[in-house]
A protein has these predicted regions:
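Structured catalytic-domain cores with a bias toward divalent-metal coordination
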Residues: 1-330
């Protein structure tokens, strides 16, 4: 499968989206790529899909689809994860933008709110098998109330992957509580963006807070040549599943792995080190040595589970790795 070349962006301080609207009403879908600037598999797939619509190979039957190939152009131009900070944290509009990602939020959040369904395409630093993340079960909690559980999980099961993860925001909030406690013990104020549970707000959380539903696709390791194809099939399946384009019905996968995030561990010092090069979904046993703090303290697994999103490049006070457990519930 051939994909268009990634574009140069001579002026990264502006934003671009491409929207197709059918004559008949229907669902409003938005597809994001390069929320993190070095994750471009989704961008390649989105550009291919845009070209197919523009060339007449595809026709929107109903509703609307908006494509954003490069959501964070500054980070993309720098070929790095962030521009000034992580766009997928504290994603909320502000009257007083301080960094570039604040400006992105002021553009992106209203755009998300104008749609009903989000597919956000990412890739990961360490690991091999693509997977998708979906949100909570229906609930009325203050942190992340939600009413579209069936639709969201139904979409996730049709993206073409067989591994699924949930529990993100709830686990992040628990991690924030631990972060605040540590700061107070060490003389910190316990105040600031990364000590607010809402700091965990990213694109999918923003979409859910606007009344829609959202799925994140992690389409493979950053440099995996199969990544754009995984992303392309997910976009196509989503368009068909929502009835936006014609195509044979996409069946939900029935044989899959479902994991729930249950714990997050921060890097406390820039010299904290893993004891080996962990990859997402490596199995860990209770008591197994995972890393060593700069002061020599050992970091061991608190339970049997799987390590997720191990980040050797994380900064002190930010997430170092997550632990997930198998979930037998659909």
């Amino acid at each position: 499968m051939q994909f268009p070349a990634l574009p140069a962006i001579p002026h990264p301080l502006q934003f671009k989206s491409v929207t197709f609207t059918a004559l008949k009403p229907g669902p409003k879908l938005i597809v994001l790529g390069a929320v993190h600037g070095n994750e471009v598999s989704g961008s390649k797939a989105i550009l291919k899909m845009i070209a197919e619509f523009e060339e007449g190979a595809r026709l929107l039957q109903k509703g609307q689809v908006t494509f954003v190939p490069i959501t964070n152009p500054l980070a993309y131009n720098r070929k790095q994860r962030n521009g000034d900070r992580n766009l997928n944290r504290n994603l909320t509009p502000t009257d007083n933008p301080v960094d570039f990602e604040d400006h992105v939020a002021n553009w992106l959040c209203p755009l998300l709110a104008a749609h009903e369904v989000l597919l956000d395409i990412h890739s990961f630093q360490k690991g091999d098998v693509p997977f998708a993340l979906f949100g909570p079960k229906n609930n009325k909690s203050k942190l992340e109330s939600f009413t579209h559980e069936e639709a969201e999980r139904g979409l996730a099961l049709r993206l073409g992957v067989t591994r699924f993860v949930d529990g993100w925001l709830d686990t992040y909030a628990k991690g924030v509580a631990n972060r605040v406690e540590l700061l107070k013990k060490t003389g910190g104020s316990g105040e600031g963006l990364n000590t607010d549970p809402r700091y965990g707000m990213g694109t999918t959380e923003c979409m859910r807070s606007s009344g829609g539903y959202a799925v994140t696709l992690e389409c493979g390791q950053h440099e995996d040549p199969q990544g754009p194809g995984v992303a392309y099939r997910a976009i196509e399946n989503t368009l068909i599943h929502l009835g936006l384009v014609e195509g044979a019905a996409v069946e939900a996968v029935t044989d899959y792995q479902h994991l729930s995030l249950v714990e997050v561990n921060d890097k406390q010092h820039f010299e904290d080190q893993f004891v080996r090069p962990w990859s997402s979904f490596d199995l860990v046993r209770k008591g197994e040595l995972i890393g060593i703090r700069h002061n020599g303290d050992e970091v061991r697994a608190s339970r049997d589970g799987f390590i997720v999103f191990p980040n050797t490049l994380s900064q002190a006070g930010q997430e170092w790795f997550y632990i997930a457990e198998s979930n037998t519930q659909p």
